[in-house]
């Protein structure tokens, strides 16, 4: 069983587990969008390639995709960018014909006894997945993607 966690967004990440154990994690692939407030966007072609290269046709695959919402004080451009990234991730998973489960940050964090503290989240992922590349503070999105993949593994199987 392959489980995948996707933290959408241009600073997000995608993580892969096999039977609950670490396989791979990487930052969300992005491409230059052009001028404007938001300069980058998630690259759908690259994301589909990553999803296919890290899965096998003969194994069941289940994806946990974080359901994102606008937060008070966010600008219109950043809200649109996040929604666009979510849609790109959702379409990429659908293109691969993988089963998908939406999950809110509150739900998967509660499962692991976490709060909104991103460093605690990263520390938890480092303990669970010591082989994963999570050593930098900026790897919190990788940590979250790994924990979502573990959440879907633990709650659906």
Question: Where are the predicted features?
Answer:
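Phosphate- and other anionic-substrate recognition elements at nucleic-acid/protein interfaces
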Residues: 1-157
């Amino acid at each position: 069983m392959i489980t995948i966690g996707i933290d959408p967004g241009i600073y997000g990440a995608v993580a892969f587990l096999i039977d609950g154990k670490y396989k791979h994690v990487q930052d969300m692939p992005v491409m230059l969008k052009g001028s404007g407030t938001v300069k980058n966007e998630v690259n759908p072609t690259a994301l589909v390639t990553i999803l296919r290269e890290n899965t096998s046709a003969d194994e069941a695959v289940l994806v946990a995709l974080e359901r994102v919402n606008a937060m008070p004080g966010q600008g219109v451009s950043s809200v649109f960018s996040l929604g666009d990234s979510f849609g790109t991730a959702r379409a990429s998973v659908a293109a691969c014909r993988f089963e998908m489960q939406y999950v809110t940050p509150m739900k998967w964090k509660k499962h692991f006894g976490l709060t909104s503290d991103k460093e605690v989240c990263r520390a938890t992922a480092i303990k669970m997945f010591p082989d994963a590349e999570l050593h930098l503070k900026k790897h919190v999105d990788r940590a979250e993607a790994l924990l979502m993949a573990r959440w879907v593994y633990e709650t659906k199987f």
